[in-house]
Amino acid sequence: MVPWLGPDDPFPPVERALSAASGAPGLLAASADLLPSRLIDAYRRGIFPWYSDGQPVLWWTPDPRMILRPREFKISPSLKKTLRRVLRDDTWEIRVDADFPAVMRACALAPRHGQRGTWITSDVIDAYSTLHRRGEAHSIETWHAGKRVGGLYGVSFGKMFFGESMYAEVTDASKIALSALVFHLRRHEIEMIDCQQNTSHLASLGGREIARKAFVAHVRAAVDSAPIPWSFDKSVLRDLLAPAQ
């Protein structure tokens, strides 16, 4: 039985999440609210919300957990060629937090294979936008010829980044944004990006699964570190493309 959380109820221990045999592996709790304080507490415990419009807020902590270590990020030859072109061409830009709510709205509209509708509702956008105003959620955006053509957003506490969603209106636009984010995180010695659930796309970029116990232990140690700065541009890609020392 999944517990229902009232406004003042704490999350149960992550070990109580449903198992694979339940049909909803990783489901921990449900609630009616998506308050910023609840969101912050969730991320700091390795928990995230994911639900469909019309459902209660469902809180998840899957085991295993998909992560991407910035040092293990895989750049294919074609992506490397694209990144070099982006660096040479002044019409391409990386902007950080230029329009966070717009990035969320674009992610909500992006078609997803095997998924109908979106969980990124207006209430979700409002909640994450509050975190953004607090400096705890960020958008990394790919711009071309003065137009935003792709990007991603996520939540950041201390030395931990929790990826949420990405979109692309032109080929590789989301990968360009992710590449810039990865090197920014490498520069600041961030060891892990939370990717939540396994997909072949994330695996192709170097993502892999780890046990929930190891993930939660890392999160609890990382989130209390000093926050990193969130100001960078496409010049970070120069170091990403440099030969390993």
Curated annotation (Swiss-Prot):
PANTHER family: LEUCYL/PHENYLALANYL-TRNA--PROTEIN TRANSFERASE (PTHR30098), LEUCYL_PHENYLALANYL-TRNA--PROTEIN TRANSFERASE (PTHR30098:SF2)
Any one biological process term the GO annotation gives: protein catabolic process
Keywords: Acyltransferase, Cytoplasm, Transferase
GO cellular component, one term: cytoplasm
InterPro entries associated with the record: Acyl_CoA_acyltransferase, Leu/Phe-tRNA_Trfase, Leu/Phe-tRNA_Trfase_C, Leu/Phe-tRNA_Trfase_N
A GO term, aspect molecular function: leucyl-tRNA--protein transferase activity
Superkingdom field: Bacteria
Family: Belongs to the L/F-transferase family.
Full protein name: Leucyl/phenylalanyl-tRNA--protein transferase
Pfam families: Leu_Phe_trans
Localization terms from the record: Cytoplasm
Function: Functions in the N-end rule pathway of protein degradation where it conjugates Leu, Phe and, less efficiently, Met from aminoacyl-tRNAs to the N-termini of proteins containing an N-terminal arginine or lysine.
EC number per UniProt: 2.3.2.6
Catalysed reactions, semicolon-separated: N-terminal L-lysyl-[protein] + L-leucyl-tRNA(Leu) = N-terminal L-leucyl-L-lysyl-[protein] + tRNA(Leu) + H(+); N-terminal L-arginyl-[protein] + L-leucyl-tRNA(Leu) = N-terminal L-leucyl-L-arginyl-[protein] + tRNA(Leu) + H(+); L-phenylalanyl-tRNA(Phe) + an N-terminal L-alpha-aminoacyl-[protein] = an N-terminal L-phenylalanyl-L-alpha-aminoacyl-[protein] + tRNA(Phe)
